[in-house]
């Protein structure tokens, strides 16, 4: 189900070999027998995106550097793309990786995102950042969130001032749902500090509010 280009200008060259022993979302045990010979289908399709920014986003220019990279619906495709390309450590500065449900664009204007918001986790340690990114990816494609239908996707942002992850959701006004998602996400990535939820509508303002709407 390959499509479009890979972010070759922003990442290291992919490894020559692709991991093939990935019959489950989580890394399988060594030597584990695999009964099914075919690919392991996911519950839904997901799409990787990337955004390599050459200058600060502003106004109508926002989103012009956003590119769709690959849509997949099997465990094997996920691990192949992750291992070769979609590790944050392969990104140059001022760039983003996204994993969103197929058909949903990582933009405020997308109908699935327009009334939503995001939980944000800052991270200044590269190893921890990459681990949290991978754990979130596996939780999403493995449908581990009870409120999975309210989740749009995840963004990994690499910046000189500090990296961060942002989990985008659909219905920002539903506090109970967002709080449950935030708590579950913290469990998934083993994060103990407070995190905040911001409405996309707040972020769109000329002078965005510095505080989040919800905190867990």
UniProtKB/Swiss-Prot annotation:
Residues 1-23 are annotated as: Disordered. Signal peptide: none annotated. One of its GO terms (biological process) is translational initiation. PROSITE patterns: IF4E. Keywords: Disulfide bond, Initiation factor, Protein biosynthesis, RNA-binding, Translation regulation. GO terms for cellular component: eukaryotic translation initiation factor 4F complex. GO terms for molecular function: RNA 7-methylguanosine cap binding; translation initiation factor activity. According to the redox status, the Cys-113-Cys-152 disulfide bridge may have a role in regulating protein function by affecting its ability to bind capped mRNA. It comes from the Eukaryota. Coiled coil: none annotated. InterPro entries: TIF_eIF4e-like, TIF_eIF_4E, TIF_eIF_4E_CS. Disulfide bonds join 113-152. Belongs to the eukaryotic initiation factor 4E family. Recognizes and binds the 7-methylguanosine-containing mRNA cap during an early step in the initiation of protein synthesis and facilitates ribosome binding by inducing the unwinding of the mRNAs secondary structures. EIF4F is a multi-subunit complex, the composition of which varies with external and internal environmental conditions. It is composed of at least EIF4A, EIF4E and EIF4G. EIF4E is also known to interact with other partners. In higher plants two isoforms of EIF4F have been identified, named isoform EIF4F and isoform EIF(iso)4F. Isoform EIF4F has subunits p220 and p26, whereas isoform EIF(iso)4F has subunits p82 and p28. This is Eukaryotic translation initiation factor isoform 4E-2. It comes from Zea mays (Maize).
């Amino acid at each position: 189900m390959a499509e479009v280009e890979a972010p070759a200008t922003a990442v290291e060259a992919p490894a020559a070999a692709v991991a093939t022993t990935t019959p489950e979302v989580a890394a399988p045990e060594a030597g584990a027998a695999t009964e099914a010979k075919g690919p392991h289908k996911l519950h839904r399709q997901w799409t990787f995106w990337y955004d390599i920014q050459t200058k600060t986003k502003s106004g109508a220019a926002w989103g012009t550097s956003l590119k769709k990279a690959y849509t997949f619906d099997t465990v094997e495709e996920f691990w192949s793309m992750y291992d070769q390309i979609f590790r944050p450590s392969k990104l140059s500065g001022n760039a983003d990786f996204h994993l969103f449900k197929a058909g949903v664009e990582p933009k405020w204007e997308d109908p699935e995102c327009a009334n939503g918001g995001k939980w944000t986790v800052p991270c200044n340690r590269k190893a921890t950042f990459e681990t949290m990114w991978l754990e979130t990816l596996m939780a999403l494609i493995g449908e581990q969130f009870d409120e999975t239908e309210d989740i749009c996707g995840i963004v990994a942002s690499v910046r000189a001032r500090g990296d961060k992850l942002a989990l985008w959701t659909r219905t920002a006004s539903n506090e109970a749902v967002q709080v449950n998602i935030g708590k579950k996400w913290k469990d998934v990535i083993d994060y103990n500090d407070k995190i905040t939820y911001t409405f996309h509508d707040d972020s769109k303002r000329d002078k965005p509010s510095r505080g989040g709407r919800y905190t867990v």
